[in-house]
Amino acid sequence: MDIVEKYFTGLSERQLEQFQQLEGLYREWNEKINVISRKDIDALNVHHVLHSLAIAKVISFKAGTKVLDVGTGGGFPGIPLAIMFPEVDFFLVDSIGKKIKVVEGVAGALGLKNVIARQLRVETMKEKFDFIVSRAVTAFPAFVALTRKRIRENSFNDLSNGILYLKGGDFEEEIRDFKDKISVYNS
């Protein structure tokens, strides 16, 4: 897992071990339940792990922060972030049960005590979180409409509570109506 060490120094031995185990665990699970495309599994560390960790370049979550990962799929960005921030609580949700089974299996194998995974839709939730993370599960305006009531008002991190949304491509059209309310970070 040299690629993670290249961009994130100061990781503990435990974190390094967990990151090193990721590829093998996902390959094993992907044989049973296809959650990552067969051609993409070879680029897991760059396309999924590092992409997820881009959030850690924007914010270093403080201990006790509660993060909701919406549409987590196989556990991205939630699992890599949970390794990076072991004192932060991560709640990973997806509407597809087989994906949650993978998340539970990977989190369990890694010994991640800070991860809870559930099969449910975010619009049915009542709990509030400091941050909501996602990897572009829908158009940004629709995502905001689904999640905005799940964000706590009082912030204690260096960045105000809100949505951290990973998305590639041309995002300008989707965020046009939010220009005065958001910050865009490019990695």
Language model features with spans:
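N-terminal auxiliary segments of SAM/dcSAM-dependent transferases
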Residues: M1-R38, D42
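Conserved alpha-helix/loop element of class I SAM-dependent methyltransferases that forms part
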Residues: E28, K32, N45-A63
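S-adenosylmethionine
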Residues: E87, F91, S95-S187
